[in-house]
């Protein structure tokens, strides 16, 4: 009888835990869905696993629901991450190289796309817990290079900051400022490699 009671209690706690995770994921998706369009400047801080600030950067973030995402880092080195909803492009103008991946295959290592995604298959790749306005996402697959992805978004759906923590402990924090909700053209989220740019098309693999 005692073993049965303990087993029942354990199953109850597990059920409550799964319910809490589901509620946190639903709450996060609901908050993100409140803002269809967002443009902002960001300040990036890279911190090593030992807690030392190793790099500062800045750039611009533009998102449009559903599924459109553009993040341009201006300093210390220009890079672009662009999603048209199907393909995720990683462009490095300095070396004239771009990598193309299917979004569905990139979510595991590039959780940024979740900021605009309604796709359940994307969200199922992460567990979500909530601490006030901060949501902590952890990948369900051990193959991910990401340890966790933190999103701070208020009850009105305003994205304040987000960060990635890699398995080695390095953290990339992006703090947003000068946030606007002006209309954005879909063309901002299209990428066409210029002549001379080397393309690593991983969609064919």
Curated annotation (Swiss-Prot):
GO BP field: lipoprotein localization to outer membrane; lipoprotein transport
Extent of the signal sequence: 1-22
Self-association and partners: Monomer.
Disulfide bonds: none
Lineage of producing organism: Bacteria, Pseudomonadati, Pseudomonadota, Gammaproteobacteria, Pasteurellales
Native source species: Haemophilus influenzae (strain ATCC 51907 / DSM 11121 / KW20 / Rd)
GO cellular component terms listed in the entry, alphabetical order: outer membrane-bounded periplasmic space
Protein name: Outer-membrane lipoprotein carrier protein
Main subcellular localisation: periplasm
Location in or out of the cell: Periplasm
InterPro entries: LolA/LolB/LppX, OM_lipoprot_carrier_LolA-like, OM_lipoprot_carrier_LolA_Pbac
Record-linked PANTHER family: OUTER-MEMBRANE LIPOPROTEIN CARRIER PROTEIN
UniProt function note: Participates in the translocation of lipoproteins from the inner membrane to the outer membrane. Only forms a complex with a lipoprotein if the residue after the N-terminal Cys is not an aspartate (The Asp acts as a targeting signal to indicate that the lipoprotein should stay in the inner membrane).
Record keywords, A-Z: Chaperone, Periplasm, Protein transport, Signal, Transport
């Amino acid at each position: 009888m005692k073993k049965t009671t303990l087993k029942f209690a354990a199953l109850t706690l597990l059920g409550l835990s799964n319910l809490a995770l589901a509620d946190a994921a639903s709450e996060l998706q609901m908050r993100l869905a409140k803002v269809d369009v967002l443009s902002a400047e960001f300040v990036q801080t890279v911190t090593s696993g030992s807690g030392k600030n190793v790099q500062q950067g800045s750039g611009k973030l533009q998102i449009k629901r559903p599924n459109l995402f553009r993040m341009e880092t201006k300093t210390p080195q220009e890079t672009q991450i662009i999603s048209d909803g199907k393909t995720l492009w990683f462009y490095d103008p300095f070396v004239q190289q771009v990598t193309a991946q299917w979004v569905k295959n990139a979510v595991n290592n590039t959780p940024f796309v979740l900021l605009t995604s309604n796709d359940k298959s994307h969200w199922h790749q992460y567990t979500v817990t909530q601490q006030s306005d901060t949501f902590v996402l952890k990948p369900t697959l051990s193959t991910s290079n990401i340890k966790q992805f933190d999103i701070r978004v208020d009850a009105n759906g305003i994205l304040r900051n987000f960060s990635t923590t890699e398995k080695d402990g390095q953290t990339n924090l992006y703090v947003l400022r000068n946030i606007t909700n002006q209309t954005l053209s879909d063309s901002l989220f299209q990428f066409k490699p210029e002549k001379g740019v080397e393309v690593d098309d991983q969609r064919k693999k």
